[in-house]
């Protein structure tokens, strides 16, 4: 059996001190700060990630009615990473064939995405207002009326 050292090839960027504190966040996805080509070139698609991607794209293609997916890995288990991969493939259809081998739906173009991270709990309209803004619904009565739960004051 080969050792881990024999099986792995470490990328030079792993040793780059300027990248040590680089941790991707869903905000990076929403604000288009992630290079999809580089992301998929430098990341491995695990079995769990592939399952999530295929099931989500089945939903996007209306081949499945499952609209929610529970990501229950422990902290550091790849939940954000999986969501970023899904978001990038939704936004960039040109990478789907390469990343999801055997997946091809010529009728499914770019999929609009919205995301919210708990790290931004100070968003002016909270989670639902942030999502409404991302999908172009921020001017709806649900976000503009004074009695809207989206306009409620946050505790503290």
PLM features: what roles do these ranges have?
Residues 41-48, 119, 123, 149:
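Catalytic cores of large soluble enzymes that bind and process phosphate-bearing ligands
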Residues 75, 127-133, 138, 142:
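Metal-dependent catalytic core segments for phosphate chemistry
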Residues 1-77, 113, 134:
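Walker A/P-loop-proximal flanking segment of P-loop NTPase domains
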Residues 77-78, 122:
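ATP-binding Walker
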């Amino acid at each position: 059996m080969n050792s881990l050292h024999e099986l792995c090839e470490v990328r030079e960027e792993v040793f780059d001190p300027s990248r040590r504190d680089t941790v991707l966040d869903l905000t990076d996805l929403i604000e288009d700060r992630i290079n999809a080509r580089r992301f998929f070139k430098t990341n491995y698609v695990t079995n769990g990630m592939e399952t999530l991607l295929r099931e989500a794209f089945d939903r996007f293609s209306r081949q499945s009615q499952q609209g929610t997916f529970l990501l229950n890995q422990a902290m550091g288990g790849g939940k954000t990473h999986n969501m970023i991969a899904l978001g990038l493939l939704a936004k960039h259809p040109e990478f789907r064939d390469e990343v999801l081998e055997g997946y091809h739906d010529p009728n499914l173009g770019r999929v609009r995405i919205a995301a919210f991270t708990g790290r931004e709990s100070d968003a002016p309209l909270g989670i639902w207002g942030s999502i409404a803004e991302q999908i172009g619904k921020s001017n709806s009565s649900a976000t503009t009326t004074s009695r809207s739960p989206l306009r409620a004051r946050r505790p503290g």
